[in-house]
């Protein structure tokens, strides 16, 4: 844990291991494979693969990364698409799983995958994406590993049209309307509202010659110690209380929140821990909080939902519609070029 989608050139991703979509003969292919060979150093990588020989479908082997910003290259032998009736899905899932097992074998803390089989292998991108997300998610729920799925475009995202249309409408109704106001489209309404407010204030002023109301008793300044005594729960205290109230294991919550075990341990050991906002929102999803409960959790960390944040509106949509799968939430955020939740 965690699992994140990024838009990047995989040869430039800094990870312990980079996954190469390989053929059975471990020969240089086109597209992503060619880019990896060129960045690593064609002669060195070719010689290393020739020394291994062949590899079966759905399996993976390891070579040094040579010129890449990584320690290893895992060569995962991917299936080509032949209509879906020849075991392609099982072979593709096995290719991901074999590469992930190599990450454990070589004590990697992070690994970066392209969307295997989706290029020249002809696998339908949405189906390839679902297999990637399902296989990676299942693995990282049981292992401490950061996994990056490196995507070049949005075409592969398996977001249903109905869900996407619903999110679009929600954003239009909230985020876009709010920003229209910010940029002057609601200026006339604000001016009218301000006029009404001034008229109401005028009406509330005492008439000339009226008997003045008795002066209010002066407020005494509270001591700093008194103010500190009235502080609410810290973020850490509230988070741990919410976990206990729901009878959940710590590991279940941080995995469902896309948070690493090490990160959770830091929070757990520091009552005054100051989290990033994306961390708070990730725990809100992982704990299946309502919007009101999330507002309270944000407040405990010194944050609030921002009407001017598209990310916040997407998260609010997910909370309102009880979408608590962190990868589905992050897929929507990725679709809108927003920072993902978790690590």
How would you label these PLM feature ranges?
Residues 1-103:
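Glycine-/small-residue-enriched capping loops at alpha/beta junctions
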Residues 258-275, 299-302:
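Recognition helix of helix-turn-helix/homeodomain-like DNA-binding domains
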Residues 123-221, 341:
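Divalent-metal-activated hydrolytic enzyme cores
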Residues 243, 254, 284:
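The alpha-helix within a helix-turn-helix
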Residues 293-342:
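Short amphipathic recognition helices of helix-turn-helix/homeodomain-type DNA-binding modules
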Residues 211-250, 327-343:
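A short, Lys/Arg-rich alpha-helix, primarily the initiator
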Residues 271-285:
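Short, basic-rich loop-to-helix N-cap that marks the start of a DNA-contacting helix
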């Amino acid at each position: 844990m965690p699992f994140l989608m990024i838009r990047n050139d995989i040869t430039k991703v800094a990870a312990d291991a980079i996954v190469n979509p390989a053929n059975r003969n471990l020969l240089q292919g086109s597209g992503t494979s060619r880019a990896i060979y060129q960045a690593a150093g064609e002669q060195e990588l070719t010689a290393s693969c020739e020394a291994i020989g062949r590899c079966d479908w759905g399996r993976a082997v390891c070579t040094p990364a040579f010129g890449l910003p990584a320690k290893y290259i895992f060569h995962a032998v991917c299936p080509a698409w032949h209509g879906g009736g020849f075991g392609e899905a099982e072979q593709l899932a096995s290719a991901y799983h074999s590469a992930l097992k190599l990450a454990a074998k070589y004590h990697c803390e992070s690994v970066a995958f392209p969307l295997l089989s989706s290029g020249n292998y002809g696998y339908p991108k949405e189906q390839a994406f679902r297999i990637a997300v399902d296989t990676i998610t299942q693995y990282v729920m049981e292992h401490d590993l950061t996994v990056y799925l490196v995507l070049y475009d949005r075409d592969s995202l398996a977001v249903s049209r109905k869900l996407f249309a619903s999110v679009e409408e929600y954003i239009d109704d909230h985020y876009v309307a709010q920003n229209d106001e910010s940029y002057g489209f609601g200026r006339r309404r604000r001016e009218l509202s301000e006029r009404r407010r001034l008229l109401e204030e005028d009406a509330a002023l005492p008439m000339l010659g009226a008997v003045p109301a008795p002066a209010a008793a002066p407020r005494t300044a509270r001591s700093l110690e008194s103010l500190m005594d009235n502080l609410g729960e810290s973020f850490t205290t509230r988070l741990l209380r919410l976990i206990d109230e729901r009878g959940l294991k710590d590991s279940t919550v941080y995995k469902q929140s896309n948070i690493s075990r090490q990160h959770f341990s830091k929070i757990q050991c520091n009552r005054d821990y100051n989290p990033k906002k994306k961390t708070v929102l990730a725990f809100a999803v992982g704990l299946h909080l309502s919007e009101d409960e999330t507002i309270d959790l944000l407040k405990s960390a010194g944050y609030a939902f921002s009407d001017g944040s598209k990310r916040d509106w997407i998260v609010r949509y997910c909370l309102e519609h009880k979408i608590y799968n962190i990868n589905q939430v992050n897929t929507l955020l990725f679709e809108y070029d927003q920072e993902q939740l978790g690590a």
